[in-house]
A protein has these predicted regions:
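Short linear motifs in low-complexity or flexible loops
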Residues: 300, 309, 315-318, 335-345, ...
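Rossmann-like NAD(P)-binding element
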Residues: 3, 31-96, 102, 120-130
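Conserved dinucleotide-binding and phosphotransfer motif residues
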Residues: 22, 104, 252
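Helical "substrate-binding/catalytic lid" subdomain
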Residues: 127, 137, 150-151, 155, ...
Length: 368
C-alpha cells in the first residue's frame, strides 16, 4: 500500500521504517531536507495513488502545525482519500479538522499512538477514532504498526472522530500518575539509610510483583545508565495532555487526585523558589514563631510572638461552628487542628500529635 507520512521526527521516522519493513511503500515529507523523500506536499500526494485511494498520515506537533498541514491537504486530496492524524491533537481539534475535510468527501481518522522510540521494534499501541468505513480502509496500516499478536491487544477503534485522541489523552494522564508513584517510592527508598541497594529493589520488582510494568523496566534502565540519577535535573516539562485530562475530569465531575498531584509536582519542579511556599514559611513564622530559613542560607530565628493581640474572627463563634463551645464537648478548635496552629506559645495541651523535640509545647510540624 502507498502511504504518505508527513513529519519524520523520532516517532514519524520510526513509523515510516516499520511500515516499510511490512512491505508498504511510504513516501515521507519533512521540513528537514535530510529526512524527506520528496520536496513538497504536492509531490507527496502525487506519489501515493492506490488506484484512486490516497492515504496521508500526519505526524507533526498539535495545534497550528497540524491544522495548517490538514488545510493544505484539503486542497490537494479529493473525494475518497483519507487523512490520519497521528499526533497528540486535542479531541476537540479533531472535530474541527473532520468538519474541514468532510464537505470534500475526504475521510478523517484520529489515532492516538503510544510506544515512543521503542515502537519501531515492539510495535505501537493504537487508539483510533472515526467512521468504520475509513478505519477499514486503513486497517493494513494499523496492522503493520501495532504489536504482533491479537489485534485487540494493541489496537482499538475507540469510537467516532475524536475518540482515539480522547483515549490517548486519558492514557497519558494515567502515565503521569504511574510515573510519579514510582518516583515517590524511589525517593523514599533513597532517603532511608537501612536500604543499601535502591536500584536492586527496583530491579527485583520487575519480575513477579504486582507493581511490575514497562515503566518500571525503564526506571531500572535509567538507574543503570545514571546511578543515583546523578546530574539529572528535577526540571520536568509536560506535554499538555495531563492538563487536558484533568480539565475533562473537572468538566465531568470525575475526581482525579492522583493526576492532579502528579501534574502539580511537575509545575513545582520548575520553580527555583516557590512564592507559595515562601508565604507558608513566612506565615508559620508570624503565627507560630517558627524559625524561617532565608535564601542566603542563614536561619532568621524565631519570630517574637506578642500575646494579647486577638484574632479578627470571633473565636467563640468558631468553636460553636465546630459543634461545641466554651466548655462544650467540641473543645477548642485550635487544639483539634494541632500541627502548625499549636506553636511554641500554645502550651502543652495540643492534641495534634507528639511533643516537639525541644519546645515541650506540642509543636509537631515539619518533623520528617
Amino acid at each position: 500500500m502507498r502511504i504518505g507520512m508527513i513529519g519524520l521526527g523520532k516517532m514519524g521516522g520510526n513509523m515510516r521504517e516499520r511500515l516499510r519493513r511490512a512491505g508498504h511503500h511510504v513516501v515521507g515529507y519533512d521540513l528537514d531536507e535530510s529526512l524527506r523523500d520528496v520536496g513538497s506536499l504536492p509531490e507527496l500526494v502525487e506519489a501515493i495513488d492506490n488506484d484512486g485511494l490516497r492515504v496521508v498520515w500526519v505526524m507533526v506537533p498539535h495545534g497550528k502545525p497540524t491544522r495548517s498541514t490538514v488545510e493544505d491537504l484539503a486542497e490537494l486530496l479529493t473525494e475518497g482519500d483519507l487523512v490520519i492524524e497521528g499526533g497528540n491533537s486535542k479531541y476537540t481539534e479533531d472535530l474541527e479538522l473532520d468538519a474541514l475535510l468532510a464537505p470534500k468527501g475526504i475521510g478523517y481518522l484520529d489515532c492516538g499512538v503510544s510506544g515512543g522510540i521503542w515502537g519501531l521494534e515492539n510495535g505501537y499501541g493504537l487508539m483510533v477514532g472515526g467512521r468504520a468505513e475509513d478505519v477499514e480502509k486503513a486497517m493494513p496500516i494499523f496492522d503493520a504498526l501495532r504489536p504482533e499478536g491479537p489485534r485487540e491487544e494493541g489496537f482499538v477503534h475507540a469510537g467516532e472522530v475524536g475518540a482515539g485522541h480522547y483515549a490517548k489523552m486519558v492514557h497519558n494522564g494515567i502515565e503521569y500518575g504511574l510515573m510519579h508513584a514510582y518516583a515517590e517510592g524511589y525517593e523514599l527508598l533513597a532517603a532511608k539509610d537501612i536500604v543499601k541497594d535502591v536500584p536492586g529493589c527496583f530491579q527485583a520488582w520487575s519480575r513477579g510483583t504486582v507493581v511490575r510494568s514497562w515503566l518500571l523496566d525503564l526506571a531500572v534502565k535509567a538507574l543503570e545508565e545514571t546511578p543515583g540519577l546523578e546530574g539529572v535535573s528535577e526540571y520536568t516539562t509536560d506535554s499538555g495532555e495531563g492538563r487536558w485530562t484533568l480539565e475533562e475530569g473537572i468538566e465531568m465531575a470525575v475526581p482525579m487526585p492522583v493526576l492532579a498531584a502528579a501534574l502539580f509536582a511537575r509545575f513545582a519542579s520548575r520553580q527555583e523558589n516557590s512564592p507559595a511556599m515562601q508565604m507558608v514559611a513566612a506565615l508559620r513564622g508570624q503565627f507560630g514563631g517558627h524559625a524561617v530559613q532565608m535564601l542566603d542560607g542563614h536561619d532568621a530565628g524565631q519570630v517574637e510572638v506578642h500575646q494579647g493581640a486577638e484574632p479578627k474572627h470571633d473565636a467563640d463563634r468558631a468553636r460553636v461552628d465546630q459543634g461545641g463551645g466554651p466548655g462544650g464537648q467540641g473543645g477548642d478548635v485550635r487544639a483539634a487542628e494541632g500541627a502548625d496552629d499549636a506553636g511554641p506559645s500554645s502550651g502543652s495541651g495540643s492534641t495534634g500529635g507528639p511533643v516537639g523535640p525541644t519546645s515541650g509545647t506540642g509543636d509537631v510540624d515539619d518533623r520528617g
